[in-house]
Amino acid sequence: MLKTIKIILLSIWNVWFYVLAFIGILTTFPLLILFSSSERFYPQFYWVARNIWSNIILFGMGFWPVVENKKKLEKGKSYMVVANHKSMIDVMLMVYCCKHPIVFVGKKELDKIPVFGYFYSKVCILVDRGNPKSRKDVYSKSIKRLEKGVSICIFPEGGVPEPGVVLREFKNGAFNLAIQFQIPIVPLS
């Protein structure tokens, strides 16, 4: 009985998340279209995502995030932002916490979600985790963004761990890029 109630509540939570995500996209649609049209507008796209879209989702889901131990990041400098990944809300939290634009490396499958997938594929670096060539492409696309002074956010576990797993083994990509470009790694949790 308890398991059934948990499944029902989690399903309601997931549906509510997607409703809020859709409301966020709908209310900012003209800006998202304009700012996703070119990489040079990415800082403006990120501003909309950070100050409107993520707030609609976070506050609508009942989250009131508090940023502790806040460090000033140097404007115009690239960073490798890494965090563990527990749920869909993690992306909103990363955007909320990082004032300076970050570009996410994310799984390609999400580009199939109607409307959201369009913007996701325009502004994120997508990886098809089962395709070695795609992983190499992520590396070259990340280099391109880092050379422009944009920071990259990677969840080094490579996805959300199974229930009961606290932390999976990290993949090397984020750390290899940080070493190659001699950029600081900023851990968020």
Task: Identify the meaning behind each predicted range.
Residues 60-189:
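Soluble catalytic domains of membrane acyltransferases
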Residues 3-66, 118-122:
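A transmembrane-helix-recognition feature enriched in membrane-embedded lipid enzymes
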